[in-house]
Amino acid sequence: MSNISTDLQDVEKIIVLDYGSQYNQLISRRIREIGVFSELKSHKISAAEVREVNPVGIILSGGPNSVYEDGSFDIDPEIFELGIPILGICYGMQLLTHKLGGKVVPAGDAGNREYGQSTLTHTPSALFESTPDEQTVLMSHGDAVTEIPADFVRTGTSADCPYAAIENPDKHIYGIQFHPEVRHSVYGNDILRNFALNICKAKGDWSMDNFIDMQIKKIRETVGDKRVLLGLSGGVDSSVVGVLLQKAIGDQLICIFVDHGLLRKGEADQVMDMLGGKFGLNIVKADAAKRFLDKLAGVSDPEQKRKIIGNEFVYVFDDEASKLKDVKFLAQGTLYTDVIESGTDTAQTIKSHHNVGGLPEDMQFELIEPLNTLYKDEVRALGTELGMPDHIVWRQPFPGPGLAIRVMGEITEEKLETVRESDAILREEIAKAGLDRDIWQYFTVNTGVRSVGVMGDGRTYDYTIAIRAITSIDGMTADFAKIPWEVLQKISVRIVNEVDHVNRIVYDITSKPPATVEWE
């Protein structure tokens, strides 16, 4: 199996070198919000490779390391000689200080360890243009700069950090000890905008319209006269991929809709009617529910579930593709967050995404992932730009493994039915309350836990259903949704009264991190 790259080589971009910060994806996201394309690159990238990527700017992310420890994440020193503007954030500032001849010590030794919001006081600088002389920022550092490199000047301090911002304006190298990418830094977006537009001289013209034109051109060049298979789930991601591919290659696209028996209530019919009927996509439906459920019988480990579903999904494709001629490519709706969360060289795997892991190496297709540089909100914007209606673009996110990862433990038809029915009630009531645009994602989970209850005149011993509802911008971080109590009560009453084998409802009030959005 080979992967067709969707690297946007000719796009004006700022790259973020990944040093393992929990916030590094947010840096990239904030730069995109400014109108400049941005992507993460390994901290191991060489100066020659940076020159090949040809960015207009480089950001060194924060991270958990200490620059003076053996094995800490490093940087090719020649990158500082490329003449490309550089912004070091937190560990990134400490690293550039260390590499360019300054001094970094454990913050405890300097007496200036900082965690949480702090007041930054700055002097005039291109980085802080049009921001107040005093502003609130988020500090999160265990080490500190005590001496700055030659030709650098101090431009910012805080009560506990004498070098909160430094710069060498002649070489366009800047360092800040705080995190501008998080909302707690009140003028963080302005600082990043100053770096991107004023210092890096980026045009700020990145848009979904540009993305469509570039991707259509790239898809046509890649595919030629061959045919492409797309696994259509009816979710936002695969639907947007389908419409984008159809716009690029028309009838060369064949959509295979795999009904794996793990879909939401009424979803199979909706997919065929909506995308096959209204949009005219050529859809082949594969009824494979028994095949998937047989493979999943007795399996309770979530990673194993994902791998099984990922493998079976592609094997079904193989079966369908063998009936067709000139099919060379398989398209997937992999997002940038999927790629990031499946692990980098600075972070452990959070979970294996079915669009990233689990694909057999002997797969006979080449892989096309047109969305793998986009975040979720950008995919919605892309769908709108493609002329797709709101009820598709704003459809609830749904994982490829479907309800398999919303049933804890072993999957049974009874458990699946409790999730299908309870989820339908949840979606209906959230829409009735006018909250469907305010809540980024919401669904129900069969926890696998049974508890004692009383219904009518008898005792019950039935399942506990959890409601998960979160607010987010891009899926990288999330908070639980503050649904009004009266709405939650109505949902709870309906589920226990209308769904068999359920007698208890709980509400998940965990943010991301520490939890992921899905339970498995």
UniProtKB/Swiss-Prot annotation:
Pathway the protein acts in: Purine metabolism; GMP biosynthesis; GMP from XMP (L-Gln route): step 1/1
GO molecular function, one term: GMP synthase activity
Entry function: Catalyzes the synthesis of GMP from XMP.
InterPro entries in alphabetical order: Class_I_gatase-like, GATASE, GMP_synth_C, GMP_synth_GATase, GMP_synthase, GMPS_ATP_PPase_dom, NAD/GMP_synthase, Rossmann-like_a/b/a_fold
Subunit-structure text: Homodimer.
Residue ranges of domain GMPS ATP-PPase in the record: 206-395
Organism, as annotated: Streptococcus pneumoniae (strain ATCC BAA-255 / R6)
Active site positions: C90 (nucleophile), H179, E181
UniProt-listed HAMAP family: GMP_synthase
EC number: 6.3.5.2
Protein name: GMP synthase [glutamine-hydrolyzing]
Alphabetic keyword roster: ATP-binding, Glutamine amidotransferase, GMP biosynthesis, Ligase, Nucleotide-binding, Purine biosynthesis
Top-level class of the enzyme under EC nomenclature: ligase
Catalytic activity: XMP + L-glutamine + ATP + H2O = GMP + L-glutamate + AMP + diphosphate + 2 H(+)
Cited PROSITE patterns: GATASE_TYPE_1, GMPS_ATP_PPASE
